[in-house]
Amino acid sequence: MGISKDRIKFNVGGRLFETTATTLANAGRDSFFGALFDDEWNLSPLEDSILFVDRNSDCFAVLLDLLRTGDLNVPANIPERLLHREASFYGLLDHVRTAKWGPFDGNRLRLSDSVKGIAPGDGTAIRAGPDGGCCVAHGSVVHVFDWMLEEHSPINLDYQRVNDVGWIDSDNIVLSACEKLGRGDGGMGLFSSSSGDLRYKFQVCHENQVKSYTAGALSFSPDYEIFASCKGRSNEYGIGVWDQITGKQTDFFYESPGWSLGDADKLQWLNGKNCLLVATLFPRKDNCYISLLDFRDKNMVWSWSDIGSPMAIDEKRVRDAIAMEDSNSICVVNEFEDLGFIDLRMYGGSVRWSSRSKLMKSKMPDEPCYPKLALHEGQLFSSMNDSISVFCGPDWVLTSRLRRSYGGSICDFSIGGDRLFALHSEENVFDVWETPPCPII
């Protein structure tokens, strides 16, 4: 290898390159180039004047420029899959991923890709992974994609319908499923995101007996807890809690008469309040039930329901809910994308609606999907038909809207790994939205 002070030469696939130690050090210790340095980050002397690497030279040029400038410039003649393969060889996949898109900002998102699957439409859920990948549930099958949008082995539950799915980390996925009649099966399982293999099955115990159950909505806490809404054959209706590390059940909050927990559509862990939001919504139930559960003393510390509330002509039914701890409120949305707010400081208070329905009613498609809500770093997102609206500021002003014309209404969306994934209902296709990387000055 040729070393002149801090310069180094490579022959990559017959093409000569010369660069500096400073550029190569940007690759990091765990990369291919990290082995060329000693413990003090000085280049180690080798016998050869030029280091030969039998790899693709065009990709090497792109990756070397990435290390030099921090910018990823890929010529049109280089397939993305090839670049990812070469980056993996050099240990630079994280560098490529960082350069492809910037920190998440709902007002700067651009459509990066659309991925069409082989399953039929009417997907159950899409969930963003922590590293920029995602998983999509269709019936009894969950399709898993890494951040390069390469599909891994699917997870197949053998005709048991998947109700919800969530990422423990980049290697592990939790699935909740319906109980299968005649088999006493169902519940929750931990699966490998790469192989699709079942690693662990979570059990529910009632009076020291293992029970068959249907698991629904999922949520996770920073203290390595898994929460799931549960329905059993006898009294196992409520919210179960499991330890992510051991897989053992640690608690169960039984629903009380006249209130719904086991049929919950949505669970959300509130770290600041150390409580779990549980929302059971129309049309799963005739009425809506939203509550905060404190598992430390098995207490429902706050609740709201539309039971007994007068319905307007347009029947503003709550279709989704999300807690916003910073403002001590819960945001709800109806089928017309009207946003409503409930004050968490008042027990059983009314909904303060912020009407936008006059703008939305004329745009309803033949088969609309119920709107969904998400909150990410101070920005509020609401899906409606084929678009996702972004709201910002203390008054939640509409600041941008994401829309594309293919695939029909959005049935679900998810934010994670600095990406937004939107699943369409009429075609089995999901969109990937990214924030462009910040310009290098």
From Swiss-Prot:
GO biological process: protein homooligomerization; protein ubiquitination
Domain BTB: 6-76
SMART domains documented for this protein: BTB
Keywords, ordered alphabetically: Ubl conjugation pathway
Pathway the protein contributes to: Protein modification; protein ubiquitination
InterPro entries: BTB/POZ_dom, SKP1/BTB/POZ_sf, T1-type_BTB, WD40/YVTN_repeat-like_dom_sf, WD40_repeat_dom_sf
Free-text note regarding domains: The BTB/POZ domain mediates the interaction with some component of ubiquitin ligase complexes.
Function: May act as a substrate-specific adapter of an E3 ubiquitin-protein ligase complex (CUL3-RBX1-BTB) which mediates the ubiquitination and subsequent proteasomal degradation of target proteins.
UniProt protein name: BTB/POZ domain-containing protein At2g24240
UniProt source species: Arabidopsis thaliana
Lineage: Eukaryota, Viridiplantae, Streptophyta, Embryophyta, Tracheophyta
